[in-house]
């Protein structure tokens, strides 16, 4: 099972909006070098909403190729049409991903019954492990622990990314879903507590730019060392907040560019590059987190 420090990887782009595969390869090498436990390719932070399906699959496939078996790659396979999610899932099943991460269908606001039917249909289209993804702040639907529990019996649904920031759900999910069901935090600000309460890992935005420290925090929390985890986590807390001064992944792409991790901080419309009033805030947070800016 995949656990620990997982990066929700950005998708680097050139100034013309095309994917910058050279920078993508460098990012994969960077995370392998820094000890990151796994990569999520083309999730929310990877701009899945603005990559058409063929490009989406290509980026995931190239990430798998660059990883070359040295780090697991989880491919984003969410869509708000079940038929589209199934088509994407079938394509990703051919490129070597270790698992897939499927966000709840967004905008059309399915009922709990609809969520269960959606995820069962997607899971039935592949043998690859599936991770559910609950982020109501983006999707306008909240998949409650009771709904997640209805999917535990599906053999290749292995866990959930819970991004509400409500750490009380860790206990409830564990009670309903059992000890073998993987629980991943999707909220950096509450990730430490999530792990200390029994979570298995974190799918993180901040991990793009502080992977070594974030890995150390996760390892300490998973080992039950609350004091060490807190000492690592506290200097990063300003960063967790400031990386959401505008919609993710606008700030983290800007930060990665300032660090020299990617050649360009370009982001696809309708998102636009980081506004100037956020520059100083983010630079201050990066300084406090001991990030070197080029």
UniProtKB/Swiss-Prot annotation:
Annotated binding of pyruvate, by residue: 45, 203
Pathway given in the UniProt record: Amino-acid biosynthesis; L-lysine biosynthesis via DAP pathway; (S)-tetrahydrodipicolinate from L-aspartate: step 3/4
The keyword Amino-acid biosynthesis appears for this protein: yes
Keyword Transport: no
Active-site residues from the entry: 133, 161
Molecular function GO terms recorded: 4-hydroxy-tetrahydrodipicolinate synthase activity
Gene3D superfamilies: Aldolase class I
GO CC terms of this entry: cytosol
Domain of life from the UniProt record: Bacteria
Localization (cell): Cytoplasm
One BP term from GO: lysine biosynthetic process via diaminopimelate
Keywords: Amino-acid biosynthesis, Cytoplasm, Diaminopimelate biosynthesis, Lyase, Lysine biosynthesis, Schiff base
Site (Part of a proton relay during catalysis): 44, 107
Top enzyme category: lyase
Documented EC number(s): 4.3.3.7
Catalytic activity: L-aspartate 4-semialdehyde + pyruvate = (2S,4S)-4-hydroxy-2,3,4,5-tetrahydrodipicolinate + H2O + H(+)
Quaternary state and interactors: Homotetramer; dimer of dimers.
Family statement drawn from the similarity comment of this UniProt entry: Belongs to the DapA family.
Function: Catalyzes the condensation of (S)-aspartate-beta-semialdehyde [(S)-ASA] and pyruvate to 4-hydroxy-tetrahydrodipicolinate (HTPA).
Name of the molecule in the record: 4-hydroxy-tetrahydrodipicolinate synthase
Organism: Shewanella sp. (strain MR-4)
Gene: dapA
